[in-house]
Amino acid sequence: MAFSPAHRLLARLGSTSIYKRVWRYWYPLMTRGLGADKIAFLNWAYEEDPPIDLTLEVSDEPNRDHINMYHRTATHVELSGKRVLEVSCGHGGGASYLTRTLHPASYTGLDLNRAGIKLCQRRHNLPGLDFVRGDAENLPFEDESFDVVLKVEASHCYPHFSRFLAEVVRVLRPGGYLLYTDLRPSNEIAEWEADLAGSPLRQLSQREINAEVVRGIEKNSHTSRVLVDRNLPAFLRFADRAVGRQLSRYLEGGELSYRMYCFTKDFAASR
């Protein structure tokens, strides 16, 4: 199927300021259209070959492919007993799953989407889990407040990614970790890598997960389509399908790079 001029324009805009302004309104629209009671995960699906063998509760099973992404990102380090901050937590599904299964001392989900945060606060009522509205580039927390910062997608929408990294360094305690998964178009890889290299955070691991995301999208396509068709108006249904098809195509063709990282804040970085 050929894409319309509007879709081709959005693809060319990439991560420009216009694109980022669009996404500031897209997520609240998704929240009002879908609701956290319908879709608790906004991240792309992920699956390995052979498949990840997670034991899930019955209520989590429909979200297995999205949970896989959270599980792989979060288990680079031990979360048990740690103070965890998730930046851009979406509808809170990942926060709920990780709180219930990995047992952090506390877990705070932050998002700029006011409607999304209200839904999270209503739905995900668990001991040690809380949600706050805030800006990823101006985190509303004291210095050295967290042991781990988790970031699954969305940073490609931030106007100033380097400011987010500076805020991560500020709120992490010495010896803490940034667990990070996101994607960039090929023409922005150099800038992405330069921002990461320019941060005081030290990289412990990195791997490209294009194949795993494509596999997850393919495996999850029917479930996602049913939910979207039931709950979104026609123009949003079309946009959602177009983005999914293009994402798979670009990942397979190398026009996008989807990566998973683990960073640490060395003690020297806090001096």
Swiss-Prot record:
It comes from Mycobacterium ulcerans (strain Agy99). GO terms for biological process: lipid metabolic process; methylation. GO terms for molecular function: S-adenosylmethionine-dependent methyltransferase activity. Belongs to the methyltransferase superfamily. Phthiotriol/phenolphthiotriol dimycocerosates methyltransferase family. The keyword Cell wall biogenesis/degradation does not apply. Pfam families: Methyltransf_11. Its EC number is 2.1.1.-. Keywords: Lipid biosynthesis, Lipid metabolism, Methyltransferase, Transferase. The keyword Plastid does not apply. This is Phthiotriol/phenolphthiotriol dimycocerosates methyltransferase 1. InterPro entries: Methyltransf_11 (IPR013216), PthPhpthDimycoMt (IPR054877), SAM-dependent_MTases_sf (IPR029063). Catalyzes the methylation of the lipid moiety of the intermediate compounds phthiotriol and glycosylated phenolphthiotriol dimycoserosates to form phthiocerol dimycocerosates (DIM A) and glycosylated phenolphthiocerol dimycocerosates (PGL).
